[in-house]
Curated annotation (Swiss-Prot):
Protein name: Glutamyl-tRNA(Gln) amidotransferase subunit A
UniProt-listed Enzyme Commission number(s): 6.3.5.7
Active site: K79, S154, S178
UniProt keyword annotations, A-Z: ATP-binding, Ligase, Nucleotide-binding, Protein biosynthesis
Subunit organization: Heterotrimer of A, B and C subunits.
Lineage of producing organism: Bacteria, Bacillati, Bacillota, Clostridia, Lachnospirales
Reactions it catalyzes: L-glutamyl-tRNA(Gln) + L-glutamine + ATP + H2O = L-glutaminyl-tRNA(Gln) + L-glutamate + ADP + phosphate + H(+)
PANTHER family hit by this protein: GLUTAMYL-TRNA(GLN) AMIDOTRANSFERASE SUBUNIT A, TRANSAMIDASE
């Protein structure tokens, strides 16, 4: 077994036992990056010497007993919308092409406190706006399973890096499916936690009421372990919520006997690829064979999730992105006449087409005369979607369905049709609107060998239910190759 084949938890155990070192692990990752990065383009920022120096420092601290966390010495990648002190943080945008933060995001800091060693920053859709990692100012990331296909987005660089063994695990962010969908496309595990579980301090905002940081990794055990490292109340984030229990690894139990699992009929209608449908329903049968009680039910309002999401997210984005104007940091246009012209030219030159599209949409729905008709109506529908999930979770422990309607599309096919790209988020978006946790676990491949993801959705603060179901399924499935 190659060093790169280990999961993050397995590697940490090997380092602790003295069977390998953080430096050896980092050298293996660097060799893999040098081998495949030119084709895949997973990283925006990668400094070989700094990564090696950080690994050597970790080895010294482990030897001295200073670094004892559950992820001590494990090389991690970080999505490029999380601030890292002294390391370029671009959001894959020209407008932040030279931005080096003076502080580190809370989730990244907690990860480092658990012993993780940062390799670099991964590529993403610009400002997390996209589902393919093709809107990046630094070029598209390709899917390691088949480089002619997209890795998903917006955390495509993180998912692809895990799948390509260019890191042992990574952090991503999820606003409407941006962890779960690339996890599905690349054949890795991804978790979007309950809103407020992981601090957003240091995460460059897209949709503030929807954004949440979470892990992308090789298996559910890694997922639970990373969650224990990064979750926690943070006074620097007003939306951070204190919880009684952060023991996610307690849910790593191969036992779903009596667990009630609901399958929404609405998720298996028109537009779902037959191969995806078959793989997901087969996964449900596996859980049923292990003692889970599986039933179909109707989850209303699914068809309203996409317009609701793109109204609310665009409105919040148009407000959040006002801060990027060329005054204090980031890109500034070279030639301009007066302050207003400088703002206009800087933003026109600095933002890409998809970001501009969403800023314009957001400005429109917030404008006088349209605010009530669009934005307020979307907030009301959001509340109804949450109510529909509340009613479902009164009956079920877990809701099971697909992550995406298809496997990974070919490069370029989504950019030419933005509506098609938006429709690809139909099964993930409502989870963000309701603030729920969602887990993506690989459950098969299509006829072309592209991975298919199983989505497990839990009630608020019930990550342990979906972790338990995902772990039990994984034990039956075996290692996903």
């Amino acid at each position: 077994m190659s060093l790169l084949d280990y999961t993050a938890v397995e590697l940490a155990a090997k380092i602790k036992a003295g069977e390998t070192t953080a430096t050896e692990a980092m050298e293996a990752v660097i060799a893999q990056i040098e081998k495949s990065e030119d084709e895949l383009n997973c990283y925006v920022t990668f400094d070989k010497e700094k990564a090696l120096a950080a690994a050597k420092k970790a080895d010294e601290d482990i030897k001295a007993g200073k670094l004892t966390g559950p992820l001590a010495g494990v090389p991690f990648a970080i999505k490029d919308n999380m601030c890292t002190e002294g390391m370029l943080t671009t959001c894959s945008s020209k407008i932040l092409g030279n931005f080096v933060p003076t502080y580190t995001a809370d989730a990244v800091e907690r990860l480092q406190n658990a012993g993780a060693v940062i390799i670099g920053k991964t590529n993403m859709d610009e400002f997390a706006m996209g589902s393919t990692t093709e809107t990046s100012a630094f070029g598209a990331t390709k899917n390691p399973r088949n480089p002619e296909h997209v890795p998903g987005g917006s955390s495509g660089g993180s998912a692809a890096a895990v799948a390509a063994n260019e890191c042992f695990a990574a952090l991503g962010s999820d606003t409407g499916g941006s962890i779960r969908q690339p996890a599905s496309y690349c054949g890795v595990v991804g978790l979007k936690p309950t809103y407020g579980t992981v601090s957003r301090y240091g995460l460059i905002a897209y949709g503030s009421s929807l954004d949440q940081i979470g892990p992308l990794c090789k298996d559910v055990t890694d997922c639970a372990t990373i969650m224990e490292a990064i979750a926690g109340k943070d006074d620097k984030d007003s939306t951070s919520i204190g919880r009684d229990d952060y023991s996610f690894t307690n849910a790593l139990v191969d036992d779903v006997k009596g667990m009630k699992i609901g399958i929404p009929r609405d998720y298996f209608g028109e537009g779902l690829d037959p191969e995806v449908k078959e793989a997901v329903l087969n996964a449900a049968k596996v859980l049923e064979s292990k003692g889970a009680i599986v039933e179909e039910f109707d989850l209303s309002l699914v068809e309203y999730a996409i317009p609701t999401y793109y109204t609310i997210a665009a409105a919040e984005a148009s407000s959040n992105l006002e801060r990027f104007d060329g005054v204090k940091y980031g890109y500034r246009t070279k030639e301009y006449e007066g302050l207003h012209n400088m703002y206009k030219k800087t933003r026109s030159e600095g933002f890409g087409p998809e970001v501009k599209r969403r800023i314009m949409l957001g400005s429109f729905v917030l404008s006088s005369g349209y605010y009530d008709a669009y934005y307020l109506k979307a907030l009301r529908v959001k509340a109804l979607i949450k109510k529909a999930f509340d009613e479902a979770f009164a009956k079920y422990d877990v809701i099971l369905g697909p992550v995406a309607p298809t496997t990974a599309p070919k490069l370029g096919s989504s950019l030419s049709d933005p509506i098609k790209m938006y429709l690809g988020d139909i099964y993930t978006i409502s989870v963000n609107l309701a603030g729920l946790p969602g887990l993506s676990v690989p459950c098969g491949k299509d006829k072309n060998g592209l991975p298919i993801g199983l989505q497990l959705i839990g009630d608020c603060f019930k990550e342990n239910n979906i972790i338990r179901a995902g772990y039990a399924y994984e034990q039956a499935r075996g290692r996903f190759e």
